[in-house]
Curated annotation (Swiss-Prot):
InterPro entries: Alba-like_dom_sf, DNA/RNA-bd_Alba, DNA/RNA-bd_Alba-like. Binds double-stranded DNA tightly but without sequence specificity. Involved in DNA compaction. This is DNA/RNA-binding protein Alba 2. GO terms for biological process: chromosome condensation. One of its GO terms (molecular function) is double-stranded DNA binding. SUPFAM superfamilies: AlbA-like (SSF82704). It is found in: Cytoplasm; Chromosome. Belongs to the histone-like Alba family. It comes from the Archaea. It comes from Sulfurisphaera tokodaii (strain DSM 16993 / JCM 10545 / NBRC 100140 / 7) (Sulfolobus tokodaii). Keywords: Chromosome, Cytoplasm, DNA condensation, DNA-binding. One of its GO terms (cellular component) is chromosome.
Length: 90
């Protein structure tokens, strides 16, 4: 099981993309310099969509520091994930 970090947002299918975009902007305003988005399984597309909307809204205010894709074993099944690390630019 993955431990959630304080600057990590786990993307699920229940919230809207706009809500996650607002969550990231609020975290940047609270003083976090880096925020990590993690989409698992069917939520991978939503994590990418959150990044695209953030890039459209903030432009050069954020940079993509790192993006990882892979799979992890959960209950003897492989589940794909994407991890997108964003950094705030001053």
């Amino acid at each position: 099981m993955t431990v959630k970090k304080p600057n990590e947002i786990l993307i699920s299918r229940t919230k809207r993309v706009e809500d996650y975009v607002l969550d990231v902007i609020v975290m940047f305003n609270q003083g976090y310099d880096e925020v990590e988005l993690k989409g698992v399984g069917n939520s991978i597309y939503k994590a990418v969509e959150v990044y695209n909307q953030l890039k459209d809204r903030l432009g050069d205010g954020i940079i993509l520091e790192k993006a990882d894709i892979g799979s992890e074993v959960k209950d003897r099944r492989r589940i794909s994930y994407i991890s997108i690390k964003l950094k705030r630019v001053y």
